Curated annotation (Swiss-Prot):
This is Trichloroethene reductive dehalogenase. Belongs to the PceA family. Catalyzes the reductive dechlorination of trichloroethene (TCE) to cis-1,2-dichloroethene (DCE) and of cis-1,2-dichloroethene to chloroethene. The substrate specificity is broad, and the enzyme can dehalogenate various substrates, including 1,1-dichloroethene (1,1-DCE), 1,2-dichloroethane and 1,2-dibromoethane. A variety of other haloalkanes and haloalkenes containing three to five carbon atoms are dehalogenated at lower rates. Trans-1,2-dichloroethene (trans-DCE) and chloroethene are degraded at rates which are approximately 2 orders of magnitude lower. Keywords: 4Fe-4S, Cell membrane, Iron, Iron-sulfur, Membrane, Metal-binding, Oxidoreductase, Repeat, Signal. SUPFAM superfamilies: 4Fe-4S ferredoxins.
């Protein structure tokens, strides 16, 4: 669709329709133009983009090479206004609900049940239903039949034909560092799943015979915080990350850490189904959450432990680990157009085992520099969007997760790693994304279960498992079915390909929000984002980019 649009509307005509032809100061700001000795009037879009190149980096976190129209704000002051006096640590957030369900949630007399994923796990594990007949999967199947293909065949598991089943089976293996144990049943006490990760290091993923680099006696790396951030960016992107950032742990930042978590376990169903009993961890995990405690202990002594295994029921975080390194993982953009495996399509869930791999390599890289770190994956420490927002990876969106100016909604993670490696903190950004979300709402219109708010941002959360105290949107995680539709229909999804029109749209969104309604309508008319294809075979016959990610946006 975008090709047709590009071929029938000239740059000059497009500028006229925007009211930007012959414009300058109104679009970019007279002060910025004057400060950089740039003209106050632009004849066409090329003039506008040339001016942007001249401003490149002046108003952005240079570590991510944000374009000129991305500005930075003060530390701890993102575009979703925060009243830090209202922010309190709370227990058990994760991206599908809470670790702590209401006490009577499992009672047959409970009337407020709406957590479709937990209920589906109960249906599958305890009631013996087929996976595709559970509420979680069935809601996605119904949406596909009503909106995409009336003859949609969900297959045996609800994801599609046998190829789709095989793809999601392979794509999800390793999620949250839970791999199928190839030695299960071959020795006494073996468990079906295997984890190599602890919260203060990686026990696996190294070359056999290579000495533990932390045991060597040569001096550790010494660099400035700015140099360290740049080498971390280079290493993280080499391992598979996209954007990166850093935050200093202050008293305010500590407020966004969970009060309690269950290490490495994502979701209340892990407790309901005793999932921790099926996983071999280097340090055992029990079936309940334990508090995160900041302590004055050596930087290499961070740990978690449970009383049942001789520990002290806490996650101990050394105060010496006073920096947070944040990063995201880019998703396979092309696959979204063919996301027939709703919910939990491989285009989204492939990110979770990648989190494990990238985190492992980053932790070992930090160890190789002579420093310490504590990871924990996507479910660790606190809500990812908060860390991503504060470190300038992106802005909070209507769907609650962040949208990045460079990669749009096509990332996952806002992953966070604690370390004593000195890092220069990156600032929150303003790319006009939050303001655009106020007038857009396409994601809410298309959400199959209406988990996304149609209202404006608010300080108080209407849901018991979301934190209050920031002026933003609060996703109803109880209704979310992991369908990826909100990501695919977002106008920012494919605005990352460096075409002139996408850069113009994004720069105008950032500098002239009066056009936001126009761009929202233009998305509906021209369809920037991918649209679902009813053809099952087209994606399988296509030549995909490496790891499915477009290479032209790097």
């Amino acid at each position: 669709m975008s090709e047709k649009y590009h071929s029938t509307v000239t740059r000059r005509d497009f500028m006229k329709r925007l009211g930007l032809a012959g414009a300058g100061a109104g679009a970019l700001g007279a002060a910025v133009l004057a400060e950089n000795n740039l003209p106050h009037e632009f004849k066409d879009v090329d003039d506008l983009l040339s001016a942007g190149k001249a401003l490149e980096g002046d108003h952005a976190n240079k570590v991510n090479n944000h374009p000129w129209w991305v500005t930075t704000r003060d530390h701890e002051d993102p575009t979703c206004n925060i009243d830090w006096s209202l922010i309190k640590r709370y227990s058990g957030w994760n991206n599908q609900g809470a670790y702590f369900l209401p006490e009577d949630y499992l009672s047959p007399t409970y009337t407020g049940r709406r957590h479709t994923i937990v209920d589906s796990k109960l249906e599958i594990e305890l009631q013996g239903k087929k996976y595709r007949d559970s509420a979680f999967i069935k809601s996605g199947i119904d949406w596909m039949k009503e909106n995409i293909d009336p003859d949609y065949d969900p297959g045996e598991l609800g994801y599609g034909d046998r190829r789709e089943d095989a793809l999601i089976y392979a794509a999800t293996n390793g999620s949250h560092n839970c791999w199928e144990n190839p030695l299960y049943g071959r020795y006494e006490g073996s468990r079906p799943y295997l984890s190599m990760r602890t919260m203060n290091g990686i026990n696996g993923l190294h070359e056999f015979g290579h000495a533990d680099i932390k045991t060597t006696n040569y001096p550790k790396w010494e660099g400035t915080p700015e140099e360290n951030l740049l080498i971390m960016r280079t290493a993280a992107r080499y391992f598979g990350a996209s954007s990166v950032g850093a935050i200093k742990i202050t008293d305010n930042v500590k407020k966004i850490f969970y009060a309690k978590v269950q290490p490495f376990c994502l979701g209340p169903w892990y407790t309901i189904t005793n999932m921790a009993e099926y996983i071999e961890y280097p340090v055992p995990v029990d079936n309940y959450a334990i508090p995160i405690v900041f302590e004055d202990i050596p930087a290499d002594q961070g740990h978690y432990s449970y009383k049942r295994f001789g520990g002290d029921d806490k996650i101990a975080v050394p105060n010496a680990l006073d920096n947070i390194f944040t990063y995201t993982i880019m998703l396979p953009e092309k696959r979204f157009k063919y996301a027939h495996s709703i919910p939990m399509d491989p285009c989204s869930c492939i990110a979770y085992p990648l989190f494990t791999e990238v985190e492992a390599r980053i932790q070992q890289f930090i160890a190789g520099l002579g420093y310490n770190s504590m990871g924990g994956g996507v479910e660790a420490w606190g809500p990812g969007s908060a860390f991503g927002n504060l470190s300038g990876l992106g802005e909070q969106s209507r769907v609650s997760s962040i949208i990045e100016p460079r990669y749009g909604s096509n990332t996952k993670g806002s992953l966070r790693m604690l370390t004593d490696l000195p890092l220069a903190p990156t600032k929150p950004i303003d790319a006009g994304i939050r303001e655009f979300c106020k007038t857009c709402g396409i994601c809410a219109e298309h959400c199959p279960t209406q988990a996304i708010s149609h209202e404006g941002p608010r300080y108080d959360s209407p849901h018991w498992d979301c934190v209050s105290g920031y002026e933003g949107w609060h996703l109803d995680y109880h209704k979310c079915i992991n369908c990826t539709i909100c990501e695919a229909v977002c106008p920012f999804f494919t605005m990352s390909n460096n075409s002139w029109v996408h850069n113009l749209v994004k720069s105008t969104v950032a500098t002239t929000p009066v056009f936001n309604g126009f761009f929202k309508n233009m998305e509906g008319a021209f369809g920037y984002g991918p649209r679902y294809s009813p053809s099952r075979d087209e994606w399988w016959a296509s030549e995909n980019p490496i790891r499915g990610a477009s290479v032209d946006i790097f």
